[in-house]
Amino acid sequence: KLLVDAVQSSKFITQKKSRELIHKLEKLVSVYEAKQLQRQVVVTNRNKTINENIYYNIDMIYNGISGDVKIRFQYFSWNIEKEMELRRDGAFYEVSPLVLSWDDENYYMIGYDAEAQLIKHYRVDKMLHIRMSDESREGKEHFKKLDMADYAKKSFGMFRGKETSVK
């Protein structure tokens, strides 16, 4: 029941994929228990993603990490009319994927951008057309120095910029 509730309430899983996952979970239990799983969890102020490719994105990122290669992808944001807009005029990003992290119900890929010489993060549900590169990953020495808990606390849900103390 907890797994069904988690799937239904998770915003990074589309409605269609939620139904498919729950149907698979129902096959693992008796008919009586399956009927109990057919319920709706009410979650307020929650929009589910429309990006059906999130599962493939996660697989491609993990393949890049395990294959020790960079990945290429397009990245988008939503404009004020709630329309998808590709960033960088649709140009592909090339990043060395380091790790996937889940924060505040969003999956993030943390990776090294060799061009900017920075560790950056990208929401996985806003990544499109992910492909593995032939180039080896870079930035491992930067990642070894990274305190993931501190990075997540300072970065996720925030805009990038210099950290400044305010009096």
How should each PLM-predicted stretch be described?
Residues 70-91, 135-148:
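Short, conserved active-site entrance elements at the starts or edges of catalytic domains
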Residues 91-94, 161:
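Short solvent-exposed loop/turn micro-motifs enriched in small/polar/acidic residues
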Residues 109-167:
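Surface-exposed, charged, gly/pro-rich loop-and-adjacent secondary-structure segments at domain edges
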Residues 1-5, 88, 108, 116:
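Short, basic/aromatic recognition patches that contact phosphate-bearing ligands
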Residues 74-76, 103, 112, 125:
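Structured loops at beta-to-helix junctions and adjacent beta-edge loops in soluble globular domains
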Residues 68-70, 101-108:
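Coil-to-beta-strand transition motifs
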